[in-house]
């Protein structure tokens, strides 16, 4: 009968490779758009270093075949991601990224391998490399804590995808069980931390997944609409009162010189103000109908403007004073 650790390791391989393959959709988008957009490149560089060191660790650990297969596959995928990012990154980003890749994935990795092979032997070599691998893995598992802080602050799981949290939980749990079966604490400690963080993320997801996002994006627009409506009501009321005063003056036989409508206080109120504006000719027509039974009429002592001259010449009456947007 096969060792249970082998079956657990196979399951861990499948889950881990799925996690490593998750950025494929991101890089398909990068290739199609020929741009790295706002995607970060540092996680792929650090993951490439981590998987490379774990592969080296598995090669020197007795019975470490499953460690080699999963991390070797991960290192190959991460190398492809780094290469694609370099191909489509902007010139400044590319120059900076090349320096980091050469320093971390070439220089640091080569230094660790050289020291381990030349200066360290047996159990000491395995211990030193195992500590480095565990430290890198803990750092990678701690990275999603920023997303957890964002969830708590915004009370929204928008920035913490469920699938990523679930696979973090599952991957950490499976490899923690594997570490107990093979008694490898360099694998167990970082994956136990990953399992705990994955559990915490799932708990946050369950707590905030039904929470509605606070209305914040449309707040400024709503305030502008309310302000515009208030100004519209105020302007309409003022124009109506002004017309009432004109009617009273006309009834008393006073001469009236109508001012031109004032420029609108708000761009969106142009049509509203136009609807309340009347020309002297229209007002005279209305008053003539109102006082049709009387034997007197009122004389306008106003100086005709361009519109009045046009009416007198052409026999038509403009409905409103044209604003800047209505002239052709």
Swiss-Prot record:
Gene3D superfamilies: 1.20.1280.290. Residues 288-328 are annotated as: Disordered. Keywords: Cell membrane, Membrane, Repeat, Sugar transport, Transmembrane, Transmembrane helix, Transport. It comes from the Eukaryota. GO terms for cellular component: membrane; plasma membrane. Residues 312-328 have a biased composition (Low complexity). Residues 27-38, 85-99, 147-161, 207-328 are cytoplasmic. The keyword Membrane applies. Residues 1-5, 57-63, 121-125, 183-185 are extracellular. It is a multi-pass membrane protein. InterPro entries: SWEET (IPR047664), SWEET_rpt (IPR004316). One of its GO terms (biological process) is carbohydrate transport. Residues 288-299 have a biased composition (Basic residues). GO terms for molecular function: sugar transmembrane transporter activity. Residues 6-92, 127-213 form the MtN3/slv domain. The chain crosses the membrane at residues 6-26, 39-56, 64-84, 100-120, 126-146, 162-182, 186-206. It is found in: Cell membrane. It holds the Pfam family MtN3_slv. Forms homooligomers and/or heterooligomers. Belongs to the SWEET sugar transporter family. Mediates both low-affinity uptake and efflux of sugar across the plasma membrane. This is Bidirectional sugar transporter SWEET16. It comes from Oryza sativa subsp. japonica (Rice). The lineage of its organism: Eukaryota, Viridiplantae, Streptophyta, Embryophyta, Tracheophyta. The gene is SWEET16.
């Amino acid at each position: 009968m096969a060792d249970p650790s082998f079956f657990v390791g196979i399951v861990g391989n499948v889950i881990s490779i799925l996690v490593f393959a998750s950025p494929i959709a991101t890089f398909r988008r990068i290739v199609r758009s020929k741009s790295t957009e706002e995607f970060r490149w540092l996680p792929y560089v650090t993951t490439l270093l981590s998987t490379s060191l774990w592969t080296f660790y598995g090669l020197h650990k007795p019975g470490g075949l499953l460690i080699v297969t999963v991390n070797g596959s991960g290192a190959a995928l991460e190398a492809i991601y780094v290469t694609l990012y370099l191909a489509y990154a902007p010139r400044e980003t590319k120059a900076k990224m090349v320096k980091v890749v050469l320093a971390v994935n070439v220089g640091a990795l080569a230094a660790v391998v050289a020291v381990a092979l030349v200066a360290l032997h047996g159990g000491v070599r395995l211990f030193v490399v195992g500590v480095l691998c565990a430290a890198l893995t803990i750092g990678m598992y701690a990275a999603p804590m920023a997303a957890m802080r964002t969830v708590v602050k915004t009370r929204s799981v928008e920035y913490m995808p469920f699938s990523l949290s679930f696979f973090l939980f599952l991957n950490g749990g499976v490899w923690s069980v594997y570490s107990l079966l093979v008694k490898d604490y360099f694998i167990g400690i970082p994956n136990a931390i990953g399992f705990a963080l994955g559990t915490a993320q799932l708990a946050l997801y369950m707590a905030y997944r039904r929470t509605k996002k606070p209305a914040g994006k449309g707040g400024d627009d709503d305030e502008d609409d309310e302000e515009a409506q208030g100004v519209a009501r105020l302007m309409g009321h003022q124009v109506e009162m002004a017309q009432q005063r004109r009617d009273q003056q006309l009834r008393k036989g006073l001469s009236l010189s109508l001012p031109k409508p004032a420029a609108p206080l708000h761009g969106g109120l142009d049509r509203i103000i136009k609807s309340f504006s009347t020309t002297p000719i229209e007002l005279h027509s209305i008053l003539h109908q109102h006082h049709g039974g009387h034997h007197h009429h009122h004389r306008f002592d106003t100086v005709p403007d361009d519109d009045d001259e046009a009416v007198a010449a052409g026999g038509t009456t403009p409905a409103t004073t044209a604003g800047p947007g209505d002239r052709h």
